[in-house]
Amino acid sequence: MVELCGGEGEGQIMLATELAQLRAMARELEAKMDPDRVAARELCRALASSVDRSIRLAASCFPPPEHPPPAAGNAGRDAAFKKRKGMAKVRRQVRVTSVQDTASLDDGLSWRKYGQKDILGAKYPRAYFRCTHRHTQGCNATKQVQRADGDPLLFDVVYLGDHTCGQAAVAAAAQSAPPEHAGQEQQRQSSLLAAGTEGIHQQVVAEPMAAPFLFTSTAAGGVDDGYFSFISPANSDCQFSSDFSAGSVGVDMDHEARFEDLFSSTLEFFQSEIQNL
């Protein structure tokens, strides 16, 4: 058995001695190879033993490190993983109004998408975003967005790290906001608006037609031809009345807009009658 070296300098001397002896045995083996095979065989055994001692000396004096140094490519990856592991993580769920709706995912912050990949066992891919001020202001905030498997209108959003750029105040307000997103509020307001519009429409339809319009005119020569009324075939509820008298021509100004519609329908009726002649 070879004794372990006591110190680094002593171990180097013993190792150098063994290697020198090994070199001498190799030269002697080369000289005796052909004349005496028995002696050459014994010399080979001694050579193998010397090599074994040299290896043991080297192992005892220069032990390998407990953890081998990582490769250059893995070092940066491990450092980035440890850095992300120590970041603050905030999870939120955002509900959209439709499958094509992506505006509801806007949280008021400036992000840039840098990747997307399929997740094992997940139905939808996961998108990765980082702050747009990462290179200009050194902001390392990131977020991950993925559609929920059971509900295509629900998104899982994960924020990693805090914003250190100029939009830090906006980010704090967004992360402290309740889960209900602005898209839901917009949908609620749209429903209320639709209901209000429907009520207005019903009111307009149910409103009765005003009294018949009075159209006065003076006939040629000032002769009073009397009074006649006309029911429009386009709308039986609209009555057009005329009274030829000596008065001036006049139209009720409160119903001016409705009179224009009635006049248009009457004109269309007369045009169709003329074409049939």
Curated annotation (Swiss-Prot):
InterPro entries to which the protein is assigned, alphabetical: WRKY_dom, WRKY_dom_sf, WRKY_plant
BP-aspect Gene Ontology terms: defense response
Compartment list: Nucleus
Pfam family, one: WRKY
Record protein name field: Transcription factor WRKY19
Function: May play a role in defense responses.
Biological source species: Oryza sativa subsp. japonica
GO molecular function per UniProt: DNA-binding transcription factor activity; transcription cis-regulatory region binding
Main location per the UniProt record: nucleus
Residue range(s) of DNA binding per entry: 100-168
SMART domains attached to this UniProt entry: WRKY
Highest taxon of source: Eukaryota
